[in-house]
Curated annotation (Swiss-Prot):
This protein's name: Hydroxyacylglutathione hydrolase GloC
Coiled-coil ranges (or none): none
Annotated Pfam families: Lactamase_B
One Gene Ontology term from the biological process aspect of the record: response to toxic substance
Function: Type II glyoxalase, isozyme of GloB, that hydrolyzes (R)-S-lactoylglutathione to (R)-lactate and glutathione. Plays a role in methylglyoxal (MG) detoxification.
Classification via SMART domains: Lactamase_B (SM00849)
Binding annotation for Zn(2+) 1: 55, 57, 132, 151
């Protein structure tokens, strides 16, 4: 698996461009700067197959429709419990003082816990990781030891829960019951900031080691 992390917009959201040896590609969480992403995909001569979304916040989906229209591909994800966020994208943009983004819905929801998504060269287990948003999901590639987990678990931190329908206890439960049981050597590609590993966060993440 080839992975290129492209931080986009003022939010510095980690857009993950992944591709196999045959140059079949997917993008996870294209949060913005569509022209830049298009240019990079074309520079690498990749065959973009699908757009994957972990959740419905604007900074993770902002370029999805432009990429869909340019490349003629579908948008898949998140869990349908985030539908209200996709429907409220114009309000999200207004709240942050950003140019308008039209509401849209993904072509496919991932509502089945543990579903295996088979793409060219990749096999992702879909985990429902609510807390940051109610429909947040993660894409886990066990064989290649990498997990794309959006805004759930960060290096030394966790996702915010002060957005609509966020819930701290639910987020902590998602991390403890879904992510921490993964192998320690699995690399976490978070929605913002540096990558980390499951083992590192088990040992040193203050939000997970607190006795409170």
């Amino acid at each position: 698996m080839n992975i290129e992390i492209i931080p986009v917009t003022a939010f510095q959201q980690n857009c993950s461009l992944i591709w196999d040896d045959e140059k079949n590609a997917a993008i996870i969480d294209p949060g913005g700067e569509a022209e830049r992403l298009i240019q990079r995909i074309e520079e690498l001569d990749l065959n973009l197959k699908v757009l994957l979304l972990t959740h419905g916040h604007l900074d993770h989906v902002g370029a999805a429709m432009q990429l869909k229209q340019h490349f003629g591909v579908e948008i898949w994800g998140s869990n349908e419990k985030d539908k209200f966020l996709f429907e409220s994208l114009p309000e999200q943009a207004q709240r942050f003082g950003l140019p308008n983004i039209d509401a849209f819905l993904p072509d496919r929801w991932f509502n089945q816990e543990g579903e295996i998504l088979k793409l060219d060269g990749f096999n992702f287990e879909i985990l429902h990781l609510p807390g940051h948003t109610p429909g947040h999901i993660g894409f886990i590639e066990h064989e290649k030891k990498v997990a794309f987990t959006g805004d759930v678990l960060f290096q030394g931190g966790i996702g915010r829960t002060d957005f609509p329908r966020g819930d701290y206890e639910t987020l902590i439960s998602s991390i403890r019951t879904k992510l921490l049981p993964l192998n320690d050597d699995i690399i976490i590609i978070a929605g913002h900031g540096s990558y980390t590993t499951i083992g590192q966060e088990k040992r040193s993440n203050p939000f997970l080691n607190s006795k409170s």
